[in-house]
Amino acid sequence: MNTEEKLNQYVLHSYGRYPMAAVRGEGSRLWDSTGKCYLDFCAGIATCVLGHCHPAVTQALQKQAATLVHCSNLYQIPQQADLAEFIVTKCVERP
């Protein structure tokens, strides 16, 4: 089965897909399996706003993956507390 056939067979059809299989990304560009380059206007629903494979994001992900990939919310997670503090103090207006 090719990628499109597998997606049709095994993945929930929540929305229509463009008939292109992205195999690599760099910055705002994506490449398909034939080597054709596309400008990515979707940016992973804003999850890739810095572009695909941004060096700083890649380095941070590699560092975190080497430390701890996932931890249950049953435990205290220092990074979660730090991020929550940062978001609240920067984004929430206090009376």
Please state what every model-predicted region is.
Residues 1-26, 80, 86:
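Active-site-adjacent loop/helix segments that line or gate small-molecule/cofactor pockets in enzymes
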Residues 1-2, 32-33, 58-59:
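Short, flexible segments with low predicted structural confidence
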Residues 9-15, 29-30, 69-70, 75:
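Generic detector of bulky aromatic hydrophobic side chains
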Residues 18, 27-29, 46, 53:
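Compositionally biased, intrinsically disordered low-complexity regions
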Residues 20-40:
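Active-site and channel-lining beta-strand-loop segments
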Residues 37-95:
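Glycine-rich loop-to-alpha-helix module at the N-terminal edge of alpha/beta enzyme cores
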